[in-house]
Amino acid sequence: MRSGCGSVGAAPLPVAGSAVYTRSIETRPGFAVSLVSPRRSVGEQPAAPALASEWLIDAARIRASLVRVRRAVDRHAAYLTRLDAVLGDGDHGDNLSTGFRAVEELLAELPGETLPGELLRAIGHRLVATVGGASGPLYGTAFIEAGFRAGETTELDPPAIGEMLVAAAEGLARRGRCTLGDKTILGTLLPAATSFSHAVADGATGAAAARTAIAAARAGMQATRPLVARRGLALRLGEHSAGHLDPGAVSCLVILIALAGHD
């Protein structure tokens, strides 16, 4: 599937010392979304004590979640390929299956002490190298940017995960030069990142924030159906691209659901 995701506006820098900062990704008219993500100084504890002990994600849990992703992508590969046959090359499901099988092989090669950020960056590079079309660089960039945002920590709490989702969405938008409303992967990922970050900033637990994010991702995916494609091979179809789900938006939902803990 060759899909490019339009340029994005430069995001304003966070105010030093602020608890929450807001960034915006440029969107098509009617698709305004702000990204709210907790910002903490190094060593600062979360404001809500419950977040310190609930829903901590370490490298082992990330590894397990990627095995779930591989299984989920394999189960949905034929459907993703059928969707892509309408708007793209008809290979999206097969390409993603190849990529996440390669990721599972990578997990067996990496040392057990690999940090979460290092693990995510390695996964991103493997996806770039193994997934055909544009979806490899797009998904790969999302994982790489999330890994950079994770830093050198051994455990990720909900505020950190919110920041990582925001970084993933921003990185994918930059790499694909896409905006919300272009009928791309971003239509699913950006609402998920926004909703998770807002929920955590409002004091939700990680599990509750994940449920909110998945609901927003599902709505975002469905919202790609009436859109006219502005990027990728579907662009050539013009108005005829409307009425079909974007295959990248669908695969993103599959991946997010698996990452959230549903096999």
Describe the function of each predicted region.
Residues 1-263:
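N-terminal loops that bind phosphate or other acidic moieties
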